[in-house]
Regions:
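Generic hydrophobic alpha-helical membrane-segment signal
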Residues: 1, 43, 74-76, 89-92, ...
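C-terminal beta-signal and adjacent terminal beta-strands/loops
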Residues: 65-72, 91-148
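Gram-negative outer-membrane beta-barrel transporters
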Residues: 1-73, 143-147
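Short, low-complexity, polar/charged sequence segments that are solvent-exposed and flexible
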Residues: 30-31, 78-82, 117-121
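Short, solvent-exposed micro-motifs at the edges of structured domains
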Residues: 30-31, 85, 101-103
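Residues that define the transmembrane beta-barrel architecture of outer-membrane proteins
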Residues: 33, 37-43, 81-85, 94, ...
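Outer-membrane beta-barrel proteins
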Residues: 31-35, 49, 75-77, 88, ...
Length: 148
């Protein structure tokens, strides 16, 4: 996180992951496959600006990107990439903060996770026990925080 100018904060991160199963007793049939839920590229960017117009107001947002990945050990289930946008505004009083948030601004439908061992099957070669979890829709949140 850095401050390009006073009251403006910007942060970013990115990751590149090149993962694959190696031949082993448990995962021999999947050697060379990508493990489930591992995106090759991920990244985040966020920013906020405070004291807008001299008011105790901070606004900001974030963008998150997750690349395509697989939802199973055999690499038969494709999970599409997705990009999420979140926004917030916070008004700060003497002993309180009032915050409004919008999560998933564009109402993106995506799969954040696949559970390979959903049925608690102990055999790693069992590939049909997947549970695919769908994303939450666009959500609005309002919170109040008090300091006593």
């Amino acid at each position: 996180t850095f401050n390009p100018v006073s009251r403006w904060r910007v942060g970013a991160n990115a990751a590149f992951t090149d993962a694959e199963f190696r031949r082993s007793t448990n995962f021999g049939t999947f050697a060379g496959n990508t493990p489930p839920n591992v995106a090759e590229v991920t990244g985040n960017l966020w920013t906020s600006y405070s004291e807008i117009g001299g008011l105790p107001l901070e606004i900001g947002g974030s963008v998150q990107y997750v690349d395509d990945r697989y939802g199973d050990n055999a690499n038969l289930v494709d999970l599409s990439s997705y990009t999420l946008v979140d926004l917030f505004a916070t008004w700060s009083g003497a002993n309180y903060n009032l915050t409004a948030r919008i999560h998933n601004l564009t109402d993106e439908i995506y799969v954040p996770w696949s559970d390979v061992f959903y049925l608690q099957q102990n055999d790693p070669g069992f590939i049909y026990a997947n549970q695919i979890m769908l994303s939450a829709p666009r959500m609005f949140e309002l919170s109040v925080e008090f300091a006593l």
